[in-house]
Amino acid sequence: MHRYRTHTCGDLREAQADETTRLSGWCHRIRDHGGVLFIDLRDHYGITQCVVDPDSKAFPLAEKLRSEWVVRIDGLVRKRPSGTENPEMPTGFIEIYVTEIEVLGAAAELPMPVFGDIDYPEDIRLKYRFLDLRREKLHKNIMLRGQVIDSLRRRMKEQGFFEFQTPILTASSPEGARDFLVPSRIHAGKFYALPQAPQQYKQLLMMAGFDRYFQIAPCFRDEDPRADRLPGEFYQLDVEMSFITQEDVFAAMEPVIRGAFEEFGNGQPVTQTFPRIPYAEAMLKYGSDKPDLRNPLVIADVTDLFARDDVSFNAFKNVIKKGGVVRAIPATGAASQPRSFFDKLNDWAKSEGAAGLGYVIFEGSDEAPVGKGPIAKFLPAEVQAAIVTRADLKAGDAVFFACDIEEKAAKLAGAARLRIGHELGLSKTGVFELCWIVDFPMYEWNEDDKTVDFSHNPFSMPQGGLEALQTQDPLTIKAFQYDIACNGYEIASGGIRNHRPEAMVKAFEIAGYGEETVVERFGGMYRAFQYGAPPHGGMAAGVDRIIMLLAGVQNLREISLFPMNQKAEDLLMGAPSEATTKQLRELHIRLNLPEPK
Protein backbone atom coordinates (compact mmCIF):
# COMPACT_ATOMS: atom_id res chain seq x y z
CA MET A 1 0.00 0.00 0.00
CA HIS A 2 1.23 3.50 -0.84
CA ARG A 3 2.73 5.43 2.07
CA TYR A 4 0.06 8.16 1.92
CA ARG A 5 -2.89 7.18 -0.24
CA THR A 6 -4.43 4.60 -2.51
CA HIS A 7 -7.18 6.98 -3.62
CA THR A 8 -7.87 10.70 -3.56
CA CYS A 9 -10.72 12.19 -1.53
CA GLY A 10 -12.76 12.57 -4.71
CA ASP A 11 -12.27 9.04 -6.08
CA LEU A 12 -14.38 6.56 -4.15
CA ARG A 13 -17.83 5.41 -5.26
CA GLU A 14 -20.26 2.60 -4.40
CA ALA A 15 -18.34 0.29 -6.74
CA GLN A 16 -15.43 0.32 -4.25
CA ALA A 17 -17.63 -0.77 -1.30
CA ASP A 18 -15.94 -3.32 0.99
CA GLU A 19 -12.46 -2.39 -0.30
CA THR A 20 -9.66 -1.27 2.00
CA THR A 21 -8.44 2.24 1.28
CA ARG A 22 -5.93 4.82 2.46
CA LEU A 23 -6.63 8.54 2.17
CA SER A 24 -4.62 11.62 3.11
CA GLY A 25 -5.85 15.17 3.43
CA TRP A 26 -7.06 17.98 5.66
CA CYS A 27 -9.72 17.68 8.37
CA HIS A 28 -12.32 19.91 6.74
CA ARG A 29 -15.01 19.45 9.38
CA ILE A 30 -15.34 17.24 12.47
CA ARG A 31 -18.74 16.38 13.98
CA ASP A 32 -19.73 14.35 17.04
CA HIS A 33 -23.06 12.55 16.56
CA GLY A 34 -23.97 10.58 19.66
CA GLY A 35 -20.37 9.68 20.42
CA VAL A 36 -19.57 8.71 16.81
CA LEU A 37 -17.06 11.05 15.13
CA PHE A 38 -17.57 12.10 11.51
CA ILE A 39 -14.51 13.57 9.78
CA ASP A 40 -14.91 15.23 6.39
CA LEU A 41 -11.49 14.64 4.86
CA ARG A 42 -10.54 17.07 2.07
CA ASP A 43 -7.83 17.15 -0.56
CA HIS A 44 -7.43 18.89 -3.92
CA TYR A 45 -9.88 16.46 -5.55
CA GLY A 46 -12.83 16.43 -3.17
CA ILE A 47 -14.21 15.46 0.25
CA THR A 48 -14.85 12.00 1.73
CA GLN A 49 -16.79 11.33 4.93
CA CYS A 50 -14.88 9.18 7.42
CA VAL A 51 -16.59 7.55 10.43
CA VAL A 52 -14.80 6.71 13.68
CA ASP A 53 -16.75 4.49 16.11
CA PRO A 54 -15.99 4.69 19.84
CA ASP A 55 -14.75 1.08 19.79
CA SER A 56 -12.21 1.79 17.00
CA LYS A 57 -8.56 1.85 18.07
CA ALA A 58 -8.31 5.13 16.12
CA PHE A 59 -10.93 6.84 18.32
CA PRO A 60 -8.60 8.28 21.04
CA LEU A 61 -6.49 10.04 18.40
CA ALA A 62 -9.56 11.10 16.42
CA GLU A 63 -10.87 12.95 19.48
CA LYS A 64 -7.74 15.13 19.45
CA LEU A 65 -8.05 16.16 15.80
CA ARG A 66 -8.88 19.76 14.94
CA SER A 67 -9.80 21.63 11.76
CA GLU A 68 -7.10 21.69 9.06
CA TRP A 69 -4.90 19.04 10.66
CA VAL A 70 -3.34 16.91 7.93
CA VAL A 71 -3.91 13.20 8.51
CA ARG A 72 -3.60 9.83 6.88
CA ILE A 73 -6.64 7.60 7.32
CA ASP A 74 -6.91 3.85 6.70
CA GLY A 75 -10.28 2.16 6.60
CA LEU A 76 -12.97 0.19 4.85
CA VAL A 77 -15.18 1.67 2.14
CA ARG A 78 -18.85 1.05 2.82
CA LYS A 79 -22.15 2.31 1.46
CA ARG A 80 -23.83 4.94 3.56
CA PRO A 81 -26.93 3.79 5.46
CA SER A 82 -30.19 4.47 3.64
CA GLY A 83 -31.39 8.01 4.20
CA THR A 84 -27.94 9.41 4.98
CA GLU A 85 -26.68 9.69 1.40
CA ASN A 86 -25.64 13.10 0.08
CA PRO A 87 -26.28 13.37 -3.68
CA GLU A 88 -24.68 16.85 -3.67
CA MET A 89 -21.26 15.21 -3.23
CA PRO A 90 -19.60 12.89 -5.79
CA THR A 91 -18.57 10.69 -2.83
CA GLY A 92 -21.91 11.17 -1.08
CA PHE A 93 -23.03 7.53 -1.32
CA ILE A 94 -20.06 6.02 0.54
CA GLU A 95 -18.12 6.58 3.74
CA ILE A 96 -14.93 5.22 5.26
CA TYR A 97 -15.07 3.08 8.40
CA VAL A 98 -11.81 4.21 10.01
CA THR A 99 -9.36 1.66 11.41
CA GLU A 100 -6.19 3.78 11.71
CA ILE A 101 -5.21 7.46 11.79
CA GLU A 102 -1.77 9.06 11.49
CA VAL A 103 -1.25 12.78 12.04
CA LEU A 104 0.96 14.11 9.25
CA GLY A 105 0.78 17.78 10.22
CA ALA A 106 -0.96 19.52 13.12
CA ALA A 107 -2.40 23.00 12.60
CA ALA A 108 -2.19 25.99 14.93
CA GLU A 109 -5.33 27.93 15.82
CA LEU A 110 -6.73 29.26 12.56
CA PRO A 111 -6.85 33.04 11.93
CA MET A 112 -9.76 32.35 9.55
CA PRO A 113 -11.84 29.22 8.95
CA VAL A 114 -11.55 27.20 5.77
CA PHE A 115 -14.98 25.58 6.14
CA GLY A 116 -17.97 27.72 5.18
CA ASP A 117 -18.48 30.83 3.07
CA ILE A 118 -18.00 33.49 5.74
CA ASP A 119 -16.23 36.50 4.23
CA TYR A 120 -13.20 37.79 6.08
CA PRO A 121 -11.33 41.12 5.92
CA GLU A 122 -9.08 41.33 2.90
CA ASP A 123 -5.91 41.90 4.93
CA ILE A 124 -6.48 38.60 6.79
CA ARG A 125 -7.25 36.73 3.56
CA LEU A 126 -4.12 38.04 1.83
CA LYS A 127 -1.78 37.54 4.79
CA TYR A 128 -2.95 33.93 5.14
CA ARG A 129 -3.53 33.37 1.44
CA PHE A 130 -2.45 29.71 1.71
CA LEU A 131 -5.47 29.16 3.98
CA ASP A 132 -7.75 31.26 1.80
CA LEU A 133 -6.74 29.16 -1.22
CA ARG A 134 -7.96 26.02 0.56
CA ARG A 135 -11.51 27.40 0.50
CA GLU A 136 -13.66 25.75 -2.13
CA LYS A 137 -14.73 28.76 -4.18
CA LEU A 138 -11.30 30.35 -4.46
CA HIS A 139 -9.68 26.95 -5.07
CA LYS A 140 -12.09 26.36 -7.97
CA ASN A 141 -11.40 29.82 -9.38
CA ILE A 142 -7.67 29.14 -9.47
CA MET A 143 -8.25 25.80 -11.18
CA LEU A 144 -10.52 27.56 -13.67
CA ARG A 145 -7.69 29.99 -14.36
CA GLY A 146 -5.34 27.18 -15.34
CA GLN A 147 -7.98 25.51 -17.49
CA VAL A 148 -8.80 28.74 -19.35
CA ILE A 149 -5.13 29.41 -20.05
CA ASP A 150 -4.71 25.84 -21.34
CA SER A 151 -7.74 26.35 -23.58
CA LEU A 152 -6.42 29.64 -24.95
CA ARG A 153 -3.08 28.01 -25.73
CA ARG A 154 -4.74 25.09 -27.48
CA ARG A 155 -6.99 27.34 -29.53
CA MET A 156 -4.12 29.60 -30.56
CA LYS A 157 -2.10 26.63 -31.78
CA GLU A 158 -5.13 25.37 -33.71
CA GLN A 159 -5.15 28.76 -35.48
CA GLY A 160 -1.52 28.25 -36.53
CA PHE A 161 0.18 30.42 -33.90
CA PHE A 162 3.51 29.52 -32.28
CA GLU A 163 4.34 30.34 -28.66
CA PHE A 164 7.39 32.50 -27.91
CA GLN A 165 8.85 33.94 -24.69
CA THR A 166 10.08 37.52 -24.82
CA PRO A 167 12.51 39.12 -22.30
CA ILE A 168 11.42 40.24 -18.86
CA LEU A 169 14.35 42.62 -18.32
CA THR A 170 14.14 45.29 -21.00
CA ALA A 171 14.41 49.03 -21.60
CA SER A 172 12.02 51.63 -20.26
CA SER A 173 9.50 52.94 -22.79
CA PRO A 174 6.64 55.47 -22.54
CA GLU A 175 3.62 53.19 -22.94
CA GLY A 176 1.12 55.01 -20.79
CA ALA A 177 2.00 53.94 -17.24
CA ARG A 178 4.98 54.07 -14.90
CA ASP A 179 7.64 51.41 -15.34
CA PHE A 180 8.95 49.14 -12.62
CA LEU A 181 12.68 49.82 -12.75
CA VAL A 182 15.43 47.31 -11.94
CA PRO A 183 18.86 48.81 -11.12
CA SER A 184 21.89 47.32 -12.86
CA ARG A 185 24.77 46.22 -10.63
CA ILE A 186 27.18 45.97 -13.57
CA HIS A 187 26.22 49.26 -15.22
CA ALA A 188 26.23 51.79 -12.40
CA GLY A 189 23.44 54.34 -12.57
CA LYS A 190 21.51 52.49 -15.28
CA PHE A 191 18.23 50.63 -15.01
CA TYR A 192 16.31 47.88 -16.72
CA ALA A 193 12.52 48.02 -16.81
CA LEU A 194 9.99 45.24 -16.46
CA PRO A 195 7.88 45.22 -19.65
CA GLN A 196 4.50 46.95 -19.56
CA ALA A 197 3.74 44.71 -22.55
CA PRO A 198 5.86 42.80 -25.08
CA GLN A 199 4.80 45.34 -27.74
CA GLN A 200 8.17 46.06 -29.32
CA TYR A 201 9.45 42.50 -29.05
CA LYS A 202 6.44 41.00 -30.76
CA GLN A 203 6.73 43.49 -33.60
CA LEU A 204 10.44 42.67 -33.87
CA LEU A 205 9.52 39.00 -34.20
CA MET A 206 7.46 39.85 -37.28
CA MET A 207 10.44 41.74 -38.71
CA ALA A 208 12.58 38.70 -37.93
CA GLY A 209 10.44 36.65 -40.30
CA PHE A 210 8.19 34.81 -37.86
CA ASP A 211 4.57 34.80 -38.93
CA ARG A 212 2.14 34.09 -36.08
CA TYR A 213 3.25 34.74 -32.49
CA PHE A 214 1.52 34.39 -29.15
CA GLN A 215 2.36 34.07 -25.49
CA ILE A 216 0.62 34.25 -22.14
CA ALA A 217 2.67 37.29 -21.22
CA PRO A 218 3.28 38.77 -17.77
CA CYS A 219 3.01 42.56 -17.89
CA PHE A 220 4.16 45.01 -15.22
CA ARG A 221 2.78 48.50 -14.64
CA ASP A 222 3.29 50.73 -11.63
CA GLU A 223 -0.24 52.11 -11.55
CA ASP A 224 -2.96 52.58 -9.00
CA PRO A 225 -5.08 49.47 -8.37
CA ARG A 226 -8.81 49.08 -8.95
CA ALA A 227 -11.25 46.17 -8.90
CA ASP A 228 -10.62 45.17 -12.53
CA ARG A 229 -6.87 45.85 -12.45
CA LEU A 230 -4.34 44.36 -10.05
CA PRO A 231 -1.39 46.44 -8.86
CA GLY A 232 1.97 45.36 -10.17
CA GLU A 233 1.42 42.60 -12.67
CA PHE A 234 -1.20 41.07 -14.91
CA TYR A 235 -1.29 38.54 -17.73
CA GLN A 236 -2.40 38.94 -21.31
CA LEU A 237 -2.82 36.69 -24.31
CA ASP A 238 -0.38 38.56 -26.54
CA VAL A 239 -0.73 38.08 -30.31
CA GLU A 240 0.96 39.33 -33.49
CA MET A 241 0.59 38.35 -37.17
CA SER A 242 2.34 39.26 -40.43
CA PHE A 243 0.88 40.16 -43.83
CA ILE A 244 -2.63 40.68 -42.48
CA THR A 245 -5.46 43.17 -42.46
CA GLN A 246 -7.74 44.08 -39.58
CA GLU A 247 -10.27 41.53 -40.85
CA ASP A 248 -7.65 38.76 -40.64
CA VAL A 249 -7.08 39.53 -36.95
CA PHE A 250 -10.83 39.41 -36.32
CA ALA A 251 -11.15 36.09 -38.17
CA ALA A 252 -8.30 34.52 -36.20
CA MET A 253 -9.14 35.79 -32.73
CA GLU A 254 -12.93 35.75 -32.60
CA PRO A 255 -13.09 31.91 -32.48
CA VAL A 256 -10.44 31.85 -29.73
CA ILE A 257 -12.23 34.32 -27.45
CA ARG A 258 -15.73 33.03 -28.22
CA GLY A 259 -14.58 29.43 -27.75
CA ALA A 260 -13.16 30.12 -24.30
CA PHE A 261 -16.42 31.73 -23.16
CA GLU A 262 -18.44 28.84 -24.60
CA GLU A 263 -16.21 26.22 -22.98
CA PHE A 264 -16.18 27.72 -19.49
CA GLY A 265 -19.34 29.85 -19.41
CA ASN A 266 -21.56 27.20 -17.78
CA GLY A 267 -23.90 27.14 -20.75
CA GLN A 268 -24.54 30.89 -20.78
CA PRO A 269 -25.23 32.18 -24.32
CA VAL A 270 -22.23 33.78 -26.05
CA THR A 271 -22.36 36.21 -28.98
CA GLN A 272 -21.65 34.14 -32.09
CA THR A 273 -20.59 36.91 -34.47
CA PHE A 274 -19.20 39.95 -32.68
CA PRO A 275 -20.81 43.14 -34.02
CA ARG A 276 -18.42 45.94 -35.07
CA ILE A 277 -19.28 49.26 -33.45
CA PRO A 278 -17.33 52.39 -34.44
CA TYR A 279 -15.85 54.24 -31.47
CA ALA A 280 -17.87 57.40 -32.14
CA GLU A 281 -21.10 55.39 -32.30
CA ALA A 282 -20.28 53.57 -29.06
CA MET A 283 -19.62 56.85 -27.25
CA LEU A 284 -22.89 58.31 -28.55
CA LYS A 285 -25.22 55.33 -28.08
CA TYR A 286 -23.71 53.82 -24.93
CA GLY A 287 -21.55 56.58 -23.43
CA SER A 288 -18.63 54.15 -23.28
CA ASP A 289 -16.02 52.52 -25.51
CA LYS A 290 -16.64 49.27 -23.62
CA PRO A 291 -20.43 49.07 -23.79
CA ASP A 292 -22.47 46.60 -21.79
CA LEU A 293 -24.80 45.31 -24.51
CA ARG A 294 -26.87 43.32 -22.02
CA ASN A 295 -28.53 46.66 -21.33
CA PRO A 296 -31.05 47.44 -24.13
CA LEU A 297 -31.13 51.22 -23.57
CA VAL A 298 -29.66 53.35 -26.37
CA ILE A 299 -28.67 56.97 -25.82
CA ALA A 300 -29.69 59.57 -28.43
CA ASP A 301 -28.33 63.02 -29.22
CA VAL A 302 -31.00 65.73 -28.93
CA THR A 303 -28.78 68.82 -28.90
CA ASP A 304 -30.47 70.31 -31.96
CA LEU A 305 -33.92 69.95 -30.38
CA PHE A 306 -32.97 71.86 -27.24
CA ALA A 307 -31.22 74.51 -29.36
CA ARG A 308 -34.46 75.41 -31.16
CA ASP A 309 -35.82 78.93 -30.77
CA ASP A 310 -39.16 77.65 -29.45
CA VAL A 311 -37.47 75.76 -26.58
CA SER A 312 -37.13 77.95 -23.50
CA PHE A 313 -35.08 75.69 -21.22
CA ASN A 314 -32.16 78.08 -20.77
CA ALA A 315 -30.17 75.83 -18.42
CA PHE A 316 -29.42 73.60 -21.41
CA LYS A 317 -29.42 76.32 -24.08
CA ASN A 318 -26.65 78.23 -22.31
CA VAL A 319 -24.46 75.11 -22.25
CA ILE A 320 -25.19 74.41 -25.93
CA LYS A 321 -24.11 77.95 -26.86
CA LYS A 322 -20.72 77.19 -25.27
CA GLY A 323 -20.30 74.05 -27.37
CA GLY A 324 -22.09 71.59 -25.12
CA VAL A 325 -24.40 68.74 -26.11
CA VAL A 326 -27.58 67.13 -24.77
CA ARG A 327 -27.91 63.37 -24.57
CA ALA A 328 -31.23 61.58 -23.98
CA ILE A 329 -31.22 58.38 -21.92
CA PRO A 330 -34.48 56.41 -22.24
CA ALA A 331 -35.97 54.75 -19.17
CA THR A 332 -38.34 52.08 -20.45
CA GLY A 333 -41.47 51.73 -18.31
CA ALA A 334 -40.26 54.28 -15.75
CA ALA A 335 -43.43 56.39 -15.83
CA SER A 336 -44.90 54.14 -13.13
CA GLN A 337 -41.96 54.72 -10.79
CA PRO A 338 -42.45 56.89 -7.70
CA ARG A 339 -41.00 60.40 -7.47
CA SER A 340 -38.21 59.02 -5.28
CA PHE A 341 -36.86 57.05 -8.26
CA PHE A 342 -36.28 60.26 -10.22
CA ASP A 343 -34.99 62.19 -7.21
CA LYS A 344 -32.51 59.44 -6.39
CA LEU A 345 -31.10 59.48 -9.92
CA ASN A 346 -30.82 63.26 -9.79
CA ASP A 347 -28.98 63.10 -6.47
CA TRP A 348 -26.66 60.45 -7.89
CA ALA A 349 -25.85 62.66 -10.91
CA LYS A 350 -25.01 65.55 -8.59
CA SER A 351 -22.74 63.25 -6.56
CA GLU A 352 -20.90 62.55 -9.83
CA GLY A 353 -20.17 66.27 -10.23
CA ALA A 354 -22.97 67.00 -12.72
CA ALA A 355 -25.64 69.68 -12.38
CA GLY A 356 -28.25 66.92 -12.37
CA LEU A 357 -30.40 64.95 -14.80
CA GLY A 358 -33.40 66.65 -16.34
CA TYR A 359 -36.26 64.30 -17.15
CA VAL A 360 -39.63 64.01 -18.85
CA ILE A 361 -42.27 61.35 -18.14
CA PHE A 362 -44.52 60.35 -21.04
CA GLU A 363 -48.13 59.39 -20.38
CA GLY A 364 -51.24 59.09 -22.53
CA SER A 365 -51.32 56.80 -25.58
CA ASP A 366 -48.57 55.45 -27.82
CA GLU A 367 -50.11 57.41 -30.68
CA ALA A 368 -49.94 60.69 -28.75
CA PRO A 369 -47.71 60.47 -25.66
CA VAL A 370 -47.82 63.57 -23.46
CA GLY A 371 -44.76 64.76 -21.57
CA LYS A 372 -44.88 65.68 -17.89
CA GLY A 373 -42.24 66.55 -15.35
CA PRO A 374 -39.96 69.45 -14.37
CA ILE A 375 -38.80 70.44 -17.85
CA ALA A 376 -41.75 69.28 -19.99
CA LYS A 377 -43.32 72.75 -19.84
CA PHE A 378 -40.28 74.20 -21.62
CA LEU A 379 -40.68 71.79 -24.56
CA PRO A 380 -43.33 72.40 -27.25
CA ALA A 381 -45.40 69.41 -28.35
CA GLU A 382 -43.47 69.18 -31.61
CA VAL A 383 -40.16 68.90 -29.73
CA GLN A 384 -41.59 66.33 -27.33
CA ALA A 385 -42.75 64.25 -30.30
CA ALA A 386 -39.29 64.48 -31.86
CA ILE A 387 -37.69 63.32 -28.59
CA VAL A 388 -40.10 60.37 -28.46
CA THR A 389 -39.11 59.35 -31.99
CA ARG A 390 -35.38 59.87 -31.58
CA ALA A 391 -35.10 58.12 -28.20
CA ASP A 392 -37.50 55.33 -29.26
CA LEU A 393 -39.99 56.08 -26.47
CA LYS A 394 -43.65 55.29 -25.94
CA ALA A 395 -46.32 56.13 -23.39
CA GLY A 396 -45.28 54.76 -20.01
CA ASP A 397 -41.58 55.54 -20.58
CA ALA A 398 -39.45 58.34 -19.22
CA VAL A 399 -36.33 60.00 -20.57
CA PHE A 400 -33.41 61.59 -18.73
CA PHE A 401 -31.11 64.26 -20.15
CA ALA A 402 -27.39 64.84 -19.63
CA CYS A 403 -26.07 68.24 -20.73
CA ASP A 404 -22.40 69.23 -20.70
CA ILE A 405 -19.37 69.38 -22.96
CA GLU A 406 -19.41 66.28 -25.15
CA GLU A 407 -16.89 64.20 -23.20
CA LYS A 408 -18.57 64.81 -19.84
CA ALA A 409 -22.10 64.42 -21.23
CA ALA A 410 -21.18 61.08 -22.82
CA LYS A 411 -19.63 59.83 -19.58
CA LEU A 412 -22.62 60.88 -17.46
CA ALA A 413 -25.13 59.50 -19.97
CA GLY A 414 -23.25 56.20 -20.13
CA ALA A 415 -23.17 55.84 -16.36
CA ALA A 416 -26.85 56.83 -16.12
CA ARG A 417 -27.75 54.27 -18.80
CA LEU A 418 -26.17 51.50 -16.72
CA ARG A 419 -27.78 52.71 -13.51
CA ILE A 420 -31.25 53.05 -15.05
CA GLY A 421 -30.99 49.63 -16.70
CA HIS A 422 -30.06 48.08 -13.36
CA GLU A 423 -32.68 49.95 -11.31
CA LEU A 424 -35.47 49.00 -13.73
CA GLY A 425 -34.28 45.40 -14.15
CA LEU A 426 -33.89 45.82 -17.91
CA SER A 427 -30.41 44.34 -18.34
CA LYS A 428 -30.11 40.69 -19.28
CA THR A 429 -28.29 38.29 -16.96
CA GLY A 430 -26.61 34.96 -17.61
CA VAL A 431 -25.26 35.93 -21.02
CA PHE A 432 -21.93 37.08 -22.48
CA GLU A 433 -22.43 39.95 -24.95
CA LEU A 434 -19.25 40.61 -26.93
CA CYS A 435 -18.46 43.19 -29.60
CA TRP A 436 -15.59 44.81 -31.46
CA ILE A 437 -15.05 48.55 -31.04
CA VAL A 438 -13.35 49.88 -34.19
CA ASP A 439 -12.20 53.16 -35.77
CA PHE A 440 -10.62 54.66 -32.67
CA PRO A 441 -9.30 58.21 -33.03
CA MET A 442 -5.55 58.28 -33.63
CA TYR A 443 -5.11 61.40 -31.50
CA GLU A 444 -6.89 63.36 -28.79
CA TRP A 445 -6.64 66.88 -27.45
CA ASN A 446 -4.93 67.32 -24.08
CA GLU A 447 -6.79 70.26 -22.58
CA ASP A 448 -4.34 70.65 -19.67
CA ASP A 449 -1.22 70.90 -21.83
CA LYS A 450 -2.99 72.30 -24.92
CA THR A 451 -1.31 69.62 -27.05
CA VAL A 452 -2.23 66.72 -29.32
CA ASP A 453 -1.60 63.31 -27.70
CA PHE A 454 -1.86 59.76 -28.92
CA SER A 455 -5.34 58.51 -28.11
CA HIS A 456 -4.29 54.91 -27.53
CA ASN A 457 -1.44 52.80 -28.94
CA PRO A 458 1.21 55.02 -30.60
CA PHE A 459 2.28 52.19 -32.91
CA SER A 460 -1.10 51.88 -34.68
CA MET A 461 -1.44 52.51 -38.41
CA PRO A 462 -3.49 55.62 -39.22
CA GLN A 463 -6.34 55.03 -41.63
CA GLY A 464 -5.09 56.68 -44.80
CA GLY A 465 -1.44 56.07 -43.90
CA LEU A 466 1.23 58.74 -44.31
CA GLU A 467 -1.01 60.85 -46.55
CA ALA A 468 -3.58 61.21 -43.76
CA LEU A 469 -0.85 62.26 -41.34
CA GLN A 470 0.40 64.87 -43.79
CA THR A 471 -2.92 66.33 -44.93
CA GLN A 472 -5.64 65.81 -42.30
CA ASP A 473 -6.45 67.56 -39.06
CA PRO A 474 -4.88 65.14 -36.53
CA LEU A 475 -8.06 65.07 -34.45
CA THR A 476 -10.01 63.70 -37.44
CA ILE A 477 -7.62 60.83 -38.19
CA LYS A 478 -8.86 57.37 -37.28
CA ALA A 479 -6.56 54.45 -36.50
CA PHE A 480 -6.68 50.80 -37.45
CA GLN A 481 -7.22 50.05 -33.79
CA TYR A 482 -9.82 47.88 -32.11
CA ASP A 483 -11.00 46.54 -28.76
CA ILE A 484 -13.18 43.66 -27.67
CA ALA A 485 -15.74 44.53 -25.01
CA CYS A 486 -17.73 42.01 -22.96
CA ASN A 487 -20.48 42.93 -20.51
CA GLY A 488 -19.04 46.37 -19.88
CA TYR A 489 -15.37 45.36 -19.65
CA GLU A 490 -12.60 45.87 -22.17
CA ILE A 491 -11.11 42.39 -22.52
CA ALA A 492 -8.82 42.87 -25.53
CA SER A 493 -7.16 45.64 -27.49
CA GLY A 494 -5.08 45.70 -30.64
CA GLY A 495 -4.26 47.33 -33.91
CA ILE A 496 -2.61 47.17 -37.30
CA ARG A 497 0.92 48.53 -36.85
CA ASN A 498 2.51 51.54 -38.46
CA HIS A 499 5.32 49.57 -40.16
CA ARG A 500 6.73 52.31 -42.42
CA PRO A 501 9.50 54.29 -40.65
CA GLU A 502 8.61 57.62 -42.30
CA ALA A 503 4.97 57.24 -41.23
CA MET A 504 6.01 56.26 -37.71
CA VAL A 505 8.24 59.35 -37.40
CA LYS A 506 5.44 61.60 -38.68
CA ALA A 507 2.92 60.06 -36.29
CA PHE A 508 5.17 60.76 -33.31
CA GLU A 509 6.02 64.22 -34.63
CA ILE A 510 2.32 65.18 -34.52
CA ALA A 511 2.23 64.10 -30.86
CA GLY A 512 5.23 66.30 -30.08
CA TYR A 513 8.06 63.77 -30.34
CA GLY A 514 10.95 64.44 -32.73
CA GLU A 515 12.75 61.73 -34.68
CA GLU A 516 15.59 61.81 -32.15
CA THR A 517 13.09 60.90 -29.41
CA VAL A 518 11.76 58.00 -31.47
CA VAL A 519 15.32 56.74 -32.03
CA GLU A 520 16.17 57.15 -28.35
CA ARG A 521 13.07 55.45 -26.94
CA PHE A 522 12.32 52.87 -29.63
CA GLY A 523 15.76 52.50 -31.19
CA GLY A 524 15.67 48.73 -31.65
CA MET A 525 12.36 48.72 -33.44
CA TYR A 526 13.12 51.88 -35.42
CA ARG A 527 16.34 50.32 -36.74
CA ALA A 528 14.48 47.14 -37.65
CA PHE A 529 12.01 49.19 -39.69
CA GLN A 530 14.91 50.26 -41.93
CA TYR A 531 15.51 46.68 -43.08
CA GLY A 532 12.21 45.60 -44.56
CA ALA A 533 9.26 45.49 -42.17
CA PRO A 534 6.21 43.47 -43.25
CA PRO A 535 2.67 44.75 -42.73
CA HIS A 536 1.66 43.33 -39.36
CA GLY A 537 -0.78 43.68 -36.51
CA GLY A 538 -2.20 41.92 -33.52
CA MET A 539 -3.86 42.32 -30.18
CA ALA A 540 -3.64 41.49 -26.50
CA ALA A 541 -6.49 39.95 -24.50
CA GLY A 542 -6.65 40.41 -20.74
CA VAL A 543 -6.43 36.89 -19.32
CA ASP A 544 -7.31 38.04 -15.80
CA ARG A 545 -10.44 39.92 -16.88
CA ILE A 546 -11.65 37.04 -19.04
CA ILE A 547 -11.29 34.63 -16.11
CA MET A 548 -12.97 37.13 -13.77
CA LEU A 549 -16.01 37.23 -16.08
CA LEU A 550 -16.11 33.44 -16.44
CA ALA A 551 -15.85 32.97 -12.66
CA GLY A 552 -18.68 35.45 -12.11
CA VAL A 553 -16.73 37.59 -9.62
CA GLN A 554 -16.23 41.35 -9.41
CA ASN A 555 -12.64 41.49 -8.17
CA LEU A 556 -9.47 40.18 -9.81
CA ARG A 557 -8.14 39.07 -6.42
CA GLU A 558 -10.75 36.30 -6.51
CA ILE A 559 -9.04 34.66 -9.51
CA SER A 560 -5.38 35.36 -8.65
CA LEU A 561 -3.05 33.18 -6.61
CA PHE A 562 -1.08 35.64 -4.50
CA PRO A 563 -2.34 39.16 -5.26
CA MET A 564 -1.27 42.39 -3.62
CA ASN A 565 -3.63 44.60 -1.65
CA GLN A 566 -4.94 48.03 -2.67
CA LYS A 567 -1.70 49.60 -1.42
CA ALA A 568 0.41 47.37 -3.71
CA GLU A 569 1.66 45.35 -0.73
CA ASP A 570 2.17 41.59 -0.62
CA LEU A 571 1.08 40.89 2.96
CA LEU A 572 2.09 37.22 2.78
CA MET A 573 5.69 37.72 1.62
CA GLY A 574 6.19 41.16 3.15
CA ALA A 575 6.86 42.99 -0.11
CA PRO A 576 7.95 45.62 -0.82
CA SER A 577 10.68 45.46 1.80
CA GLU A 578 13.77 47.47 2.64
CA ALA A 579 17.04 46.56 0.96
CA THR A 580 20.14 45.98 3.06
CA THR A 581 22.99 48.47 3.07
CA LYS A 582 25.13 45.87 1.29
CA GLN A 583 22.54 45.41 -1.47
CA LEU A 584 22.24 49.16 -2.00
CA ARG A 585 26.01 49.58 -2.09
CA GLU A 586 26.35 46.85 -4.73
CA LEU A 587 23.76 48.65 -6.85
CA HIS A 588 25.41 52.06 -6.35
CA ILE A 589 22.19 53.45 -4.86
CA ARG A 590 21.81 56.01 -2.09
CA LEU A 591 18.32 56.60 -0.67
CA ASN A 592 16.78 60.06 -0.58
CA LEU A 593 13.45 59.45 1.12
CA PRO A 594 10.68 62.05 1.41
CA GLU A 595 10.07 63.62 4.80
CA PRO A 596 7.34 61.80 6.78
CA LYS A 597 4.01 63.63 6.58
Curated annotation (Swiss-Prot):
PROSITE patterns: AA_TRNA_LIGASE_II (PS50862). CDD domains: AspRS_core, EcAspRS_like_N. GO terms for molecular function: aspartate-tRNA ligase activity; aspartate-tRNA(Asn) ligase activity; ATP binding; nucleic acid binding. GO terms for cellular component: cytoplasm. Transmembrane segments: none annotated. It catalyses: tRNA(Asx) + L-aspartate + ATP = L-aspartyl-tRNA(Asx) + AMP + diphosphate. It is found in: Cytoplasm. ATP binds at residues 221-223, 490, 542-545. The record marks 33, 83 as: Important for tRNA non-discrimination. Residues 199-202 are annotated as: Aspartate. Its EC number is 6.1.1.23. One of its GO terms (biological process) is aspartyl-tRNA aminoacylation. Keywords: Aminoacyl-tRNA synthetase, ATP-binding, Cytoplasm, Ligase, Nucleotide-binding, Protein biosynthesis. L-aspartate binds at residues 175, 221, 456, 497. HAMAP family: Asp_tRNA_synth_type1. Belongs to the class-II aminoacyl-tRNA synthetase family. Type 1 subfamily. Homodimer. Aspartyl-tRNA synthetase with relaxed tRNA specificity since it is able to aspartylate not only its cognate tRNA(Asp) but also tRNA(Asn). Reaction proceeds in two steps: L-aspartate is first activated by ATP to form Asp-AMP and then transferred to the acceptor end of tRNA(Asp/Asn). PANTHER family: ASPARTATE--TRNA LIGASE, MITOCHONDRIAL, ASPARTYL/LYSYL-TRNA SYNTHETASE. This is Aspartate--tRNA(Asp/Asn) ligase. The gene is aspS.
